[in-house]
């Protein structure tokens, strides 16, 4: 069975540096697993690998979308499977590197066969809700899908519409469909996660890296994006940590120092969520950030 390597970890933990070392030593090719690196024109605030780093170790699945475009976990899975096959055909080992855990989960575990959105049906559900009230729509969901109704509040119309839409299109509940997964990956997956043992070390790295981004011109990068008429804070690209806070600063919502503080706090919260995912992840080999033996540890596991 062909082998693939995953290298996960929170933001600012040293994934890219270790991945580039691996490319030099183990005939790997990198596939980025990062929901921010997919966007063009978002280089500084996403800590996109530099031109020198990309020359040493090309990354697949970066710069593949405009910031105005959407990209889902299902899109990622399809793209990643294609790239894995191309790398294996070239006689190399795919190395999947990043911190977007939903993408890793979609790739490794597969996705449920939920139906695509139906705009006409959504409009019909909204019309019914205006006539009957959202509580009555929630009562309908409780009859059709009791488990989902426990999770979804009557005041959360977006998720309520989706759950009802799935029931009406498929004749099955979202709960039933979510238990069906795609075929498992036909690969031997060797999984690693890298992070400092001390959370304070990670917090310092996050702060130092954001301040470096500011020195590299991050505010000007966001200012250029903000000039585009097709971008706004509702888009996933502009909700990336750092970008949202800088946009709000440029809108005059708060001063520069507050922006810096808010961006650093948001990045720390992201790292905390990433670590929470990783602690429950099965079959994971842990590496400590900054340890010289990490490369040899990975190579030993991959023989």
UniProtKB/Swiss-Prot annotation:
Keywords: ATP-binding, Magnesium, Nucleotide-binding, Transferase, tRNA processing. Residues 34-37, 158-162, 239-244 are annotated as: Interaction with substrate tRNA. InterPro entries: Dimethylallyltransferase, IPT, P-loop_NTPase. The record marks 100, 122 as: Interaction with substrate tRNA. It catalyses: adenosine(37) in tRNA + dimethylallyl diphosphate = N(6)-dimethylallyladenosine(37) in tRNA + diphosphate. Its cofactor is Mg(2+). It comes from the Bacteria. GO terms for molecular function: ATP binding; tRNA dimethylallyltransferase activity. Belongs to the IPP transferase family. This is tRNA dimethylallyltransferase 1. It comes from Shewanella sediminis (strain HAW-EB3). The lineage of its organism: Bacteria, Pseudomonadati, Pseudomonadota, Gammaproteobacteria, Alteromonadales.
